[in-house]
Each structure stands twice: as C-alpha cells, then as structure tokens.
C-alpha cells in the first residue's frame, strides 16, 4: 500500500474538504465562484512583525493540482461514488490567486493570500495552503528575530536533525535563509535552493580517533578550511590547546577558520578560548557557538560579554520551539450570487478576534513620504483607491477613537497577481532576492516595532468603507439569527 511514485498532494487534505466538495458537486453549486482570505490573528513569538513565506511551495502545489489514479482508487475504496470521482479525475485549477511576496513583512488580521476560484477548487486547496504558509511564515519570522539580535554576526542553520521530518528540514533551511541566516548545514537545501552550506565535524569524529590532536590533524589533511569542535573531552585543557597545536604545526597548509563550542558555559568558555587564541597569535580565528540557541539565549550571551563571532542555531529555530504553530486560517469572504456578482460572507463569534472581515479586499502599506517609514497597513474593499482620500484617515478597527491623518503618503499594494484564471503569471524571485527584500522591508518600520521585548503594535486598519461593510454584515447576520430564534419559539 505504501507507494509514493504515483502520489499527488491532493489527498494531503482534511477529509471534510472532500466531503464538502462532494456535497457542493451534488448540489450543483461547485462551480460558483468563491473568495477566501488566508491570514493569522495573533503575532507569533510576541513579535512586532512577521515575515510571509511559502509562496514558492504553494506555486509548486498549484502547478501539479490534480488527482492521480491512485488517489481516485483510494477515495473509491473509502466509499466515494464513481460519478463524483469521474468529475474529480479531470479537475484542474482554474482560479486566481493574489498574494504577498516572500519576505514581505506581515501582521495579524490582514490577508496574506487571496483565492478566487470555483468553490470546489478553493475548498480543496485550503488545507495544504495553510499547512505550507503556517510553517514557512513561522520559521522565517523566527529566523528574522534571531537575525535582529545577532546583528552582523554570522548565523548558521543547524536544525535538520531536529526538524519535524524531512520536508520540514529542507524547507525550514530555506525559510531560515530568507529570514536572514547566512548558511545551512543541509546539503540538499544547498543543492536545491542555492543556499551556502557550512559545517564542521561531530564529536564522533574525535571519539573515533580517541585523541583530539590526532583527530584535528586527520581532518586537516582533507579540509583546508578548518573549524575544530573543541568540547569532546575538555574545552580549555584539551580541545583549544590541540586546535592551536595543529594550526601551528600545519601553518599555511590550512586556514584555521575557527573553533566550535557546543556545550558548557558558553560565555565563560568563549572568553577564555578567545584569550588563548589571541595569545597564540590566532587573532582572526573565529569562535562559533551552538547548543540550543535562539534569540533569547543569544541576547543573554551577548549581555554576558561572550566572545562569539558566529552562531549555529538548530532545534529552537527549525521547530519554532517557543510557538510551534502560527495559527493561520482560511475564511470564506464572498460567494457568487444568482445575479453573477458577489455576496459578502462573514463569520461571527463570541470572540471578537474571530469575527471575519467580509468582501474582496486589497492590502496597502502606507509609507509616510517625509519619514520613509510605514504608518500602518490599510485594508480596503477591492474597488477603493486609497489616494481618493486626502488626507488619509487611519483608525483602529476596534478602538476607533485611535486615529491619525496622513497627508503625504505612498500606498503600496502588498498583493501580487500569482494566478489568473488558472495560469501562472508571476515570476518567482530567487531566495537571495527575497532575503534582500526582507532586509529592505525591515528598514521601513520603526525600531519600536522590531523591539525584542514588548514591541510597539503595528497598525492594521480598515478603510471607512471596509469597516462600514463589516458592521453592516454583522447587523444583517444578527437580525437573521434573531428571526431564526423567533421562528423556533
């Protein structure tokens, strides 16, 4: 039964998606056009910003959208009827997708990606889109936070062995690179995505030879650029002295790039190792630290004066250790009506943050021309032009008394056309371009938004028309519920 050769991603799905698809098809509403927004509600890691990522893999999926023969055989085996399966056999994606680009700064309650497609298609891609964007955005955000703390220090992604399976390791390495890391230990990620690779050797290498001096010398015989792992036996009494000894003996035959500390009191050991290296004349040799690092650990080590030049970050990056789920959702906001236009849809909840914003919308970043900084993100209905309102009024969507007026601004549409009527129309940037785009984007928000602790909340506001439309729909649904309640009495 376990065969991947004919495996598509169409069944990488929640069962209820296929159940709903069958019901839509049976009721002959499956071709109705529908609009869904993908977004998250709360900022991950208590961060002041997040970083959108995952579009490359979304495109990979959509380009191969379609049920395989083995998919259909399996669906038949669990009870789906031949007439429905016959329809699925020829199903292709014919919808449109607008999305932020990879490396875009993003914030809670704004559409990262918008799908406009026949209802059955839009429903069948929900689970995998969420699966992709939730993970990629989470890890890229974590990586960017670590980059902010590390400043100009080198950052190496070491998470493959601790990742939640093979795909998470591969795509997590890519996410980390876009988020600001300099390299990865994952050789496959280097091959597929052009990410620089880096690595040293393991404790097992030293243990194999039973002696650090011998092990380091054997390593140097085949590797000119040497980074020696010095904590297998005793960092200061054995590891560092033997690394220095080998480097002195081999001289110009090797490039003594650095030593790596993977255990113990990194702050103390790095300071002592730095002193020993400097006294031996190796002032340019770098000290690399690893061992359960993240932005908090690096902040602490820097505060203690640790003499670390490069950081190898693994487990706590690749798993999103302190918040392993982004919590993005995919919500219906409009559906085709009998007249062929759209009727807005809203979901209500006793939790205010779970009330959706109905209608087809655009998201703009409002840049103050005087400061060059972002004043906030501005969500409008699709037919609105933010330049029509001068000055532009930004107000908090809940605490509406919080407002400001912007006279001189640029409104940047954050969504790009990715698919139009089933055709890919977007040229995917390279990983290096996405990485640089993020670096530039971070310059557009205030330092207060990037603070590690208690960052200033970045405004995400609705236009007056969008706000009015939302509250109109809330009132309509409330009236409908009231009528139903009266009918049931």
What are the residue ranges of the model-derived segments?
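Ordered alpha/beta subdomains of enzyme catalytic regions
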Residues: 1-222, 331-489
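Glycine-rich phosphate/ribose-binding loops and adjacent secondary-structure elements
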Residues: 204-375
């Amino acid at each position: 039964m376990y065969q991947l050769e004919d495996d598509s991603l169409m069944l990488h799905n929640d069962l209820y998606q296929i159940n709903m698809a069958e019901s839509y098809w049976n009721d002959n509403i499956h071709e109705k056009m529908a609009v869904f927004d993908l977004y998250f509600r709360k900022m991950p890691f208590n961060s002041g910003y997040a970083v959108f990522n995952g579009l490359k893999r979304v495109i990979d999926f959509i380009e191969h959208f379609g049920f395989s023969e083995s998919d259909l055989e399996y669906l038949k085996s669990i009870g789906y009827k031949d007439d429905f399966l016959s329809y699925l056999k020829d199903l292709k994606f014919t919808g449109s997708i607008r999305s932020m680009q990879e490396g875009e700064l993003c914030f809670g309650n704004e559409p990262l990606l918008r799908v406009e497609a026949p209802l059955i298609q839009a429903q069948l891609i929900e689970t995998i889109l969420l699966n992709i964007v939730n993970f990629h955005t989470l890890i890229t955000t974590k990586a960017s936070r670590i980059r902010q703390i590390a400043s100009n220090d080198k950052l190496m992604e070491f998470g493959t062995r601790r990742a939640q399976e093979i795909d998470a390791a591969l795509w997590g390495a890519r996410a980390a690179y876009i988020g600001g890391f300099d390299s990865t230990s994952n050789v496959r990620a280097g091959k597929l995505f052009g990410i620089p690779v880096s690595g040293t050797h393991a404790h097992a290498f030293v243990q194999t030879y039973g002696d650090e001096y011998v092990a380091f010398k054997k390593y140097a015989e085949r590797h000119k650029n040497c980074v020696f792992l010095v904590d297998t036996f005793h960092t200061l009494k054995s590891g560092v002295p033997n690394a220095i000894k080998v480097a002195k003996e081999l001289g110009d035959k090797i490039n003594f790039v650095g030593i790596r500390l993977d255990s113990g009191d990194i702050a103390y050991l790095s300071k002592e190792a730095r002193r020993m290296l400097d006294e031996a004349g190796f002032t340019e040799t770098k000290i690399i630290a690893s061992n359960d690092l993240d932005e908090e650990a690096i902040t602490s080590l820097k505060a203690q004066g640790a003499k670390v030049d490069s950081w190898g970050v693994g487990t706590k990056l690749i798993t999103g250790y302190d918040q392993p789920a982004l919590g993005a959702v995919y919500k219906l906001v409009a559906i085709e009506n009998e007249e062929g236009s759209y009727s807005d849809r809203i979901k209500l909840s006793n939790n205010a943050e779970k009330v959706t914003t109905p209608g087809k919308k655009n998201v703009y970043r409002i840049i103050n021309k005087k400061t060059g900084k972002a004043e906030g993100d501005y969500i409008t209905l699709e037919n609105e032009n933010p330049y029509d309102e001068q000055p532009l009024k930004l107000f908090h969507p809940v605490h509406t008394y919080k407002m400001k007026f912007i006279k001189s601004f640029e409104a940047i549409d954050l969504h790009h056309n990715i698919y139009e009527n089933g055709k890919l129309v977007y040229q995917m940037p390279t990983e290096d371009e996405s990485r640089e785009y993020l670096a530039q984007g971070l310059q557009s928000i205030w330092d207060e938004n990037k603070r590690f602790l208690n960052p200033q909340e970045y405004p995400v506001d609705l236009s007056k028309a969008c706000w009015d439309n939302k509250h109109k729909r809330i009132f309509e649904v409330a009236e409908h519920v009231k009528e139903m309640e009266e009918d049931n009495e």
